[in-house]
């Protein structure tokens, strides 16, 4: 072959090879780099220049730990985005770290997985490599939770300076750990001037433990540092994780223009000074434990906020001004000094708490503070103020109450008739021009849910709903009921015709389902449990007869049990108009058995009857480590009867002294207990054992030949009412304070002893 011809062929081959090697990262348009796998992504990042856009191909990227580094410019950031926003799914064990200058990420969805590290999104690679002047926008994190309920992580951790997190959608964090945290653990992350705006913080269910905040700025260790973070125009939708929805633990932050919708807890100025809270709207909708603003520390400004329909009390009230600890350590309660609380509207709320938390330790009252031009209106004319200590250090001036009878605070308040009307923004204002300078301003902007988050991802209602699906009829033919349950969809109703049903396998419940009978549908079962609730499951039983006569001769049977493993998704059980019999084949046959790291939003028993039970009805006491964790938020029993139950009717346990949760709650009304709690294996020696329950109502019941109700108060100010019960051959209830020398506040009255 001639030499020149050979050289031409070699040159052509090299050219083809170079073209093929570069095609994967060839810009489809100038500055745009399309990548379709992780190797191409790493190469694209390594070669990225200011102004470049790296696009991830549509589809699922599994087990993808994204490290996005680079140095862009103010007018030419380096961007990482989706080929089509909302069409790129980051799944499995995945996360995102940003490090560098002027970086921007958008359009991704984190779903069907969890982070293998401490954060899903982190504005740093490691402690030495932070992100500055960078932005995360239009990103979704949906139920991206570690399967171990109490394995803690953050979804978003902001480090560095001058970063922005905006128009993102975060929903369904179910494991322990704050949803979003601003971290100040080095000087390079302090005085950061971050901006957090227009985000949708979707429903966060009750965690049942400390560590369920939605947003935290700083920590107690760095709380004397300033953050200068702006939290603006975010929508907090039913963020119920714990008592602090937003926890500010640093100084000089602004929280303004946000909307809190039916969220349980408060915006808490926990640590740090000179924060401003203004133009926020709290809409409680009369939902339990919905709260407003809690004030601690120095120089806090609370102005032009609107708070309506909030039911919270104590640390969860509509407005709470705390007592402090003299010479407080950095992680306790610093005294309120120079607080300015002005031009706020508090409409139809339950509680305003001043000098809250006053005790032997928290004895430093608020001082040098102002409470001015605030509007406090309640349609029922009730005084919403509770004064726990001396409030002479607060100057009250130019405030308005509406016809409160015998108000505790008179000086600085005009007590008059106030007529309200809804304005165009949907908020209530006085119709009198004379009150135009009192309360929140009329031009207050009510943030719309649709103006937050992303436009291309639904803000769906994830609440558990029974009886919303199809009606499915089944007969007692062997296997038919089990097959119907397996094939049913969420919300379906399975209607059992009259007959005897024998189930030879455990029925796993992984969706909200109703089993409906007409009181002639009898179910027996041959395994150690009839129903097992697993993640996603909730169960309603109505009009059924359930017998344990055919169950195995084992210790520890149950009608319903939870998964033995950690459950992320809270569940509900509702039983009505049903009969449960022969639950006594062997010892400790409980109606409901639960495991550690499981949480019921509610267990409700209505108009039902239980007899011959060798265990307990509700054994919800598996969180015995005294960490403030519990198994059920609301346990409710009404209009029901219990006969010959060897264990306790209910055994609920929430140990420790942590003050971060609202539950558990226990209600027993209009019911009859006969020979309940009398078994020799009943360790509590009580008919009802409640340890650390926060709200208890036991009213208008009949107790016959049962041991005493035993209640142990552990923390906070539990609300316990035991009234109008008839006790026949039954001792009086006992209520004990385990960690306080104060006399307990339980109300025990109008009970009839026979």
Predicted feature locations:
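C-terminal motif of bacterial Sec signal peptides marking the signal peptidase cleavage site
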Residues: 23-24
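Surface beta-loop-beta hairpin patches that serve as ligand-binding interfaces in beta-rich domains
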Residues: 409-477, 487, 737-754
